[in-house]
């Protein structure tokens, strides 16, 4: 970004609204990629500017006319420069992301929350489960946002948050503590189901790595800051999904269900397993690539995935 723009912003912009407008203009001029919780320059600017001022996203309109100190202007401008020049996702600049309307800590150890599964949680999996779940598993938990959101949605349920990485689980545990959910959400290190105790869950929710090799090669620069461990899943993006499909029925109650996100790799899944009765879920807020299977359906199609059992 040209120095003249930086100097003008620091010296001539005075209010929160000024800084929001300037940030949107810089984002538009830079043609950055959106996809880490926002899809437009205004929301991206809000998620950068307000947290940089230690303000909530829903501040009253009249507060936006408040004047900024020099240090506040410098802090915002510095982050805008890094977002534009280095293409770092806003969430990694502020260490804040939102999921199901709640704030989470994130850094480069975990993916930025953005799963459409959040809509299912907000609707309490209406039409997908037939009773209040007592035990929920969030497989490949990352920041822990799905597990914690499920705990809010079902306050009487016990939720296990599983990931293979200790670094990831450190972030998970931080968010569990920030939300005061230590009594309800348990972080567990496991390579998928391999190291889990023999628990039967009413609901397994999973957003595993699912980006195929072709998409990995074409990812916008912003996604290069996210951990490859949380994205890449082999040539067809199904490396982990197959293992989950193979092992999930052993960990489900008789009336339990599996909900799994595979994103763009849904094409590979449908092509390779046309006989599996995936229910592909629809979302009012956008998103796709999420399927549901019951335990019985998983048992019925077990032969397709038996070679991938742990």
UniProtKB/Swiss-Prot annotation:
Q: Which UniProt keywords apply?
A: Methyltransferase, S-adenosyl-L-methionine, Transferase
CDD domains under this entry?
AdoMet_MTases
Q: What is its EC number?
A: 2.1.1.298
Which molecular-function annotations from GO does this UniProt entry contain? nucleic acid binding; protein-glutamine N-methyltransferase activity
Give me the disulphide-bonded residues. none
* Catalytic activity as recorded in UniProt: L-glutaminyl-[ribosomal protein uL3] + S-adenosyl-L-methionine = N(5)-methyl-L-glutaminyl-[ribosomal protein uL3] + S-adenosyl-L-homocysteine + H(+)
Top-level taxon of origin = Bacteria
Q: What Gene3D superfamilies does the record tag this protein with?
A: Vaccinia Virus protein VP39
Report if keyword Phosphoprotein is assigned. no
GO cellular component terms attached to this protein's record: cytosol
Q: Which SUPFAM superfamilies match?
A: S-adenosyl-L-methionine-dependent methyltransferases (SSF53335)
GO BP annotation list = methylation
Q: What does this protein do?
A: Methylates large ribosomal subunit protein uL3 on a specific glutamine residue.
Family, per entry: Belongs to the protein N5-glutamine methyltransferase family. PrmB subfamily.
Q: In its UniProt entry, what is this protein called?
A: Ribosomal protein uL3 glutamine methyltransferase
Q: What is the species listed in this Swiss-Prot or TrEMBL entry?
A: Yersinia pestis
